[in-house]
Amino acid sequence: MASRSHTEVRFKFGQNWQRFLSSVNEQRVLAAEKALTTVLGNIRGKTFLDAGCGSGLSSLAAHRLGAHVAAFDYDTQSVACTKELQRCHGLSWRTEEGSVLDANYLTKLGQFDIVSSWGVLHHTGKMYEAFRNIAIPVKPGGLLFISIYNDQGFLSLYWKVVKRIYNTGWFGRVFMTLIHLPYVGGRFVVRKITRRPIERGMSLWVDYIDWLGGYPFEVAKPRDVIEFFAGLGFTVVKTNLVGGSLVGRRSGNNEFVFRKNHDQPERHR
């Protein structure tokens, strides 16, 4: 497994997910199932790897949809969250601690019909290394489903500073949370007016804290992501871009579904 540094600045993702667990109900699970089905279609009988399982909600949704699920996360508390979700629903699938930066670990996992890593790779601190490694457990002909923060240029640099300050201690957390409350308040009002649910069964507040604190933090232009994975032997089959185009500058995650070619070229070094 990739080594942990005691001095590294890293958001406590698992701690945030533990707050979310108490709000996981049938409505949220159904929303997560719908999100997976919309993007991936029928996954019944497929092998499914949740790389960076977080709260475990996506793993649970995939399991209920009939997939054979395995899951891992770098964060110990996130692994605990997923196992608690299993216990609460009386279900079981392979869940363990692991790192997408550990190529040997990913090789030992074997290969899967579907590998999902939603909102994970840009938080590793080595995003392009994570891109290379996440290709390992995808079967030839299999699907890779990822989401990556959109590159907003200067605004992305601003958010990186915000996240770095947030993770300096309690004062940074309180200060950054308070001065950005209008950001989440505006989103809350819009959703109340439009009655639009939170995507993927998530919580607006948990997403807000994850956005403010999520560090390490990297971004990429959609075209760069597509071209990089093409070099790894993948063909893009579906995108959902926050800017609506390959050059959009809105904030949020760009979603990509890639298919691994049977005759893929040599991997990037």
Predicted regions and their residues:
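Conserved alpha-helix/loop element of class I SAM-dependent methyltransferases that forms part
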Residues: 26-45
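Conserved class I S-adenosyl-L-methionine
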Residues: 46-52, 143-184
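Class I SAM-dependent methyltransferase SAM/SAH-binding core
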Residues: 57-102
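A short acidic, Gly/Pro-enriched loop at the edge of an enzyme's catalytic core
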Residues: 104-114
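A short SAM/SAH-binding and catalytic strip from SAM-dependent methyltransferases
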Residues: 114-126
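A short glycine-rich, Lys/Arg-flanked "PGG" loop and its adjoining helix->strand segment in the class I
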Residues: 128-140
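Short alpha-helix
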Residues: 216-232
